[in-house]
Amino acid sequence: MEKVIDITERVPAMKKRRRRRTNFKFLALVTIFLFIIIILLYFQLPYSDIKKIDIKGAALKEDTYYIDQSNLKINDSLWGFKISEVEQAIAQHEWVKSVTVERKFLNEVQITVEEWQKVAYISQDGEFYPMLDNGIVFEESNEIVPIDAPIFRDFENEALRKKLLKELANLKPEVLSLISQINANPTEADPYSITLFMNDGYEVRADANTLAEKLNYYPSIIAQIESEDVSEKGIVDIEVGSYYRPFSDEYTLIKENTEKTEEPAEETENADTEEGGQLEEQNEEEPE
C-alpha cells in the first residue's frame, strides 16, 4: 500500500523551490540591468573612443596617408563610422588592390591594405616612376636611380609595357631581383622583342609574351654555361629556343655586318668620282 504524504509535509519543500526560482530570476534581472548600465557607461565615457589606428601592408604610401584617407581620427567614437565607407574611401585608389577595416579590442582600429606589387620603374623626364603589376604607373617619382626593381627604357608602346609588367609579376622573386634594366627593341617581325641587362653581367634577348615561362629557368641556364668553363660573358637568347653566344662573337658579327653595309656605299662613291674625272678630261679635250 502506497504511503500517503500529507500536504503539510510538502509545503516547506515547495516554498524552498519557489524561493530558489525567485532568486534566480532576480539575479538574472540584476545581471541584465548591470550589463546595460556598463554598455551605457562605455558609450558615454572616453573608453569607447578611438585610441589607436594601426595600418598594415602600406609600402607605396606612408601610414599617415591612409589614416587621412580613412577620415578617422583619434578620440572619434569607435562605433561612429561604417566599416564599408572607410574601406571604399581607401580602395578607390588605383594602386590599392584590397583593404580590410576591423575594430580591435575596445578602442583600436586596424586597417590592412594590400597594394599592387611594384615590379619595375620607368624612366621619364629624368625621373623614375614605379610601375605596378596591374599595369599602372605610380604617381610618385624618385630622382635617385632605383636598385630594388628593373628599369624600363624606350617603352612607348603601352600594350607592350602592360604585357611585360604582367610577365614580371609571374617571375620568381630571386629571378626578378637579377634584372637591372629592360629595353624595348620591337621590329615589324617581332613587336614584343625586348633586351634584359642582368646584374650578373649577362644580356638576355627575349619575347615579352613568353618571358616568365622561360626566364624562370635563368639560374639553371647560367649554371650550365659557367659549368662549361666559359671564360667570357655574353648573350642568352630565349626568344625562340635557348642558346648562348659570347659578347666577342656578337660584336664581331655586328662589325662584319657594318663593314658589308659600308662597302657598297664606298664603291658607289668611288665610281661617281671616277665618272666625274672622265667627264672633266673630255671637257678639257674639246676645242674652244
From Swiss-Prot:
Membrane disposition: Single-pass type II membrane protein
Residues in coiled coil: none
Keyword Nucleus: no
Top-rank lineage group of the source organism: Bacteria
Extracellular side: 47-288
Pfam families recorded: FtsQ_DivIB_C, POTRA_1
Sequence ranges of Basic and acidic residues compositional bias: 253-263
Keyword DNA damage: no
GO cellular component: cell division site; plasma membrane
UniProt subcellular location: Cell membrane
Main location: membrane
Cytoplasmic topological intervals: 1-25
GO process terms (BP): FtsZ-dependent cytokinesis
Keyword entries, A-Z: Cell cycle, Cell division, Cell membrane, Membrane, Transmembrane, Transmembrane helix
Functional summary from the UniProt entry: Cell division protein that may be involved in stabilizing or promoting the assembly of the division complex.
Similarity comment: Belongs to the FtsQ/DivIB family. DivIB subfamily.
Protein name as it appears in the record: Cell division protein DivIB
Organism: Solibacillus silvestris (strain StLB046) (Bacillus silvestris)
Gene that encodes the chain: divIB
